[in-house]
Amino acid sequence: YFGNGKKWGSFPSISGGWVLSKEKFLSNVSWINNLKLRASYGVSGNNRIVDFAFLDLLYGANYTYGGGTGVSSPGLVSSNSFLSNPNITWESTGQTNFGVDLSMFKNRIGITLDIYKSKTDKLLLQQSAMAFTGVPQFWNNLGSLENKGFEIELNTKNVQGRNFSWTTSANISHNQNKILELGTEAFLLNQGERTEVYRNKVGDPLVVYYGFKTDGVWLSQEHITKSGLTSSLSSIFVPGGLKIVDVNKDGKLDNSDRTDIGNPYPDFNWGITNTFKFGGFDFSFLMQGVQGGKIINGDPNYNESRRTITTYNKNRWISPNYPGDGKTPFSTNGYNWMLTDYVVEDASYFSLREVNFGYTLPDQITKKFKVSSMRFYFTAQNLFFQTANGYRGLNPEGRFNNGPYSSVLIDGYQRGSFPIPQTLTAGIDINF
């Protein structure tokens, strides 16, 4: 991955803990079973880039010669994928973590809290190369990134009887990131396949959707004329088309009106599992969800012309006499390819992720089969999935990750995602 002197990296770590519940000043606090404070610091490295990015690569190619005779001979040609950079080295992340482990009331309640902050230096990113090089980009150690957040886990024994028990395990996490430095750059702009633009700016989250705000649609040509706006962009003033907001109030609709219209990072991830046991029966279910975060839904640009799909065509503008809801553009509005908040949607969801039901045979029965245990079970996944109001896609977890979308500087684009499948499974666990 890296050249001489950079092939190996050193990534140390240190951790420590203090069990407060064993100290004398807490020895008489009977309701605390365990109380531990933890702290750690560690450094990790990343070298996950293309092979030999530090070398100028040659590839086999045919060389034609002979004054147009068509005679060719095998030869070599330099790579046109990326420019070499012999100076690239390991990306490193240093993380500080503080945690608390608490068990109380005869271990019926357990709480784990972790707070962390990390800084990634020498980010391995692809940077645009100058045009005279003949290649579009090269790998470089460019800038630094900060992540910070928390994770909380709660475990409770709600009922603990001889024949019946009920336990709950819940967790919630929050993370936010911020670009601290981008080398000599204040920001970078990266473009997807459908002209949508992603901005990477110092002080902002790693990826921000950079596009146009809209205010419904142009209801008629008269509506456009009365606005008094002008534009150098094509297909901006079309009856039934999206009404772009003049963000900078200069009377012109152009690229300077682009602004922050969302990012892909959720506010919270959460999950909760309840488990019940009664005799030989067991039953559990997992609810899981995401709150916040936006997604660029590329499907409307593909499906808006398919008039049989109600989700994309209900209340659509048809004519000045049939304007629909005044917010949904007409079906041949090609400039919807430009990134606008019309296709930026809430990626929040709530799901009944998994349900398990089982029955374990008593020992006196399993002995007859000469096995140590036998359990029959039934599992159902994704029985219920509720997306945020206004989301028009099929799977808020789906992301496009081919081509330019494989870059860490581009995130949150969705197109053609498969629906979330419901899975039913039945089986037997046998231990001999």
Task: List each model region and its residues.
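C-terminal beta-signal and terminal closure region of outer-membrane beta-barrel proteins
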Residues: 66, 142-147, 192-219, 324, ...
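Transmembrane beta-strands of outer-membrane beta-barrel pores
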Residues: 1, 20, 41-45, 115-121, ...
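Solvent-exposed loop/turn elements at secondary-structure boundaries
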Residues: 27-91, 110-145, 202
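Structural signature of Gram-negative outer-membrane beta-barrels, strongest in the C-terminal barrel
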Residues: 1-60, 91-104, 116-118, 147-148, ...
